[in-house]
Amino acid sequence: ATRLSVFDFDETLAFTEAEIDILDQEGNVIDTTTNQEEYDKWEDDERIKSGELKFDYSELDVITNPTEIVAVTDIMRDRSADSDTQVMIVTARSSRTSDDIHRYIDAINIPTDDLYVKAMGDEGLGRGKGGFIFSILEEFPDIREVEFYDDSQKNITDVNTAKAQALEQEMVDVFDVYLVIDGVPQKA
């Protein structure tokens, strides 16, 4: 493959009904996030950083009522049909959802034979997508073109850092980053 196409899952390929609870030390629910913006606000909260409050990701272990985001899945469908492109889904969820994600992608008629799902949630952080993509470029020097789709501004910023490094080191010729807002990819 000479091109790497990387997609986030939630709010990028599909809208899902996942909620993340914020718990106090006794396990009481303090608040519930239903989208990326709410999660990002909480992630920056001092009480989360200090460990006074914590996220409960258990609901993310299953994919609930996914709704296809056609503007993005059409791109994925196109890339999957191209033998020079390696398609990946990189998600903040845990690997327990990998089979569900494969089944969903299969159900919307995108071939999954060569689809690679990387679940970052097992590493205890839903971040670091830039570092992950950079490590792929180091391992597979034939990849000269990268495209990345995600609805999280933090992930976009992280991947843009990897992009700058990869372009500076002439590892790639093209590295396009898209922020998906309300199901529409916009160059970021």
Task: Report each predicted region and the residues it spans.
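A short, conserved beta-to-alpha structural element at the edge of catalytic cores
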Residues: 32-45, 168-188
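Alpha-helical substrate-recognition element adjacent to the catalytic core
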Residues: 2-126
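Structural alpha-beta junctions
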Residues: 82-83, 108-114, 164-178
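Conserved Lys-Pro-Asp/Glu-containing loop-to-beta segment of HAD-superfamily phosphomonoesterases
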Residues: 3, 129-159
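Cofactor-binding loop segments of dinucleotide-utilizing enzymes, especially the Rossmann-like FAD-
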Residues: 92, 151, 182
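Short, aromatic/basic amphipathic alpha-helical patches
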Residues: 100-109, 157-169, 188
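Residues at the starts of beta-strands that form the adenosine-phosphate
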Residues: 86, 145, 176
